[in-house]
């Protein structure tokens, strides 16, 4: 049974806690609006108005925490950067998830092409036929007797190929020899690289005095036709050397016997004299590192990514995670408890975002 997961926000929306949006930062009196919003919320949910209600105390602490971060311009700018990164990451994830769901739903469905697609296909076929000088009016159906003769001829040709092109068993009794195989492979594949490469010039018709490689152009399937029939599209052609695509010579049992075995095959599993000594040394180093990590505490871990972190590329400085200082460690458990009591005092429309998992509100780390 599939489970539908809801979006999880690792960064709490402090503006929403105060009944605002991040658009308030664009206003000239941003600080004053944040202060007034905090005053309204603090007055409405002050613990003195609800004596004995622990859930109200927790909500008041949450409102105060949001104001402590947003009232300072530096902390507010850092928080805005974090919020932008979080929303962008969530947006990318949801887009990918939607694309996957659409693809999964479309599997097995046969959609008829639209009229525009049919028209576009016909126009493209007409253009290709025109370039090749192909006249579709001359098309005629192949008679049934000729089709049967052609099919019979192809079947006979395929049967003869199965006999003539059957590979010889190079290893006696089917026993594969890795050393012999590697020696033959190295010999027949040890040559100059003949991979395809882009070429922006015209190949020379003359042999070079040096040992340079000659090239011959061939069609690039990504650029079959040129719109201008008066020129050759040299700038976008692909070239390969003249040996490109040539088949390797056929190997016989006698060739294998003459080549022998590769020397490096038999010795690759031989352990050196210092093998076990080096192994013990590495195990000892690993144990020391493990002990060191086990003794490390929260503040001992390095936060410096040497400029290679994701947030470093965004120009954000998160060397000091201010939310860690603002969120008490017990807030997660306390907020979970107050959810059951919330509807008794607070209208259902208030703080609906609090129904999301609160583990994201107590996590002040930048990355995981």
Curated annotation (Swiss-Prot):
Residues 13-83 form the J domain. Disulfide bonds: none annotated. Gene3D superfamilies: DnaJ domain. InterPro entries: DjlA_DnaK_co-chaperone (IPR050817), DnaJ_domain (IPR001623), DnaJ_domain_CS (IPR018253), J_dom_sf (IPR036869). Keywords: Chaperone. PROSITE patterns: DNAJ_1 (PS00636), DNAJ_2 (PS50076). This is Putative J domain-containing protein R445.
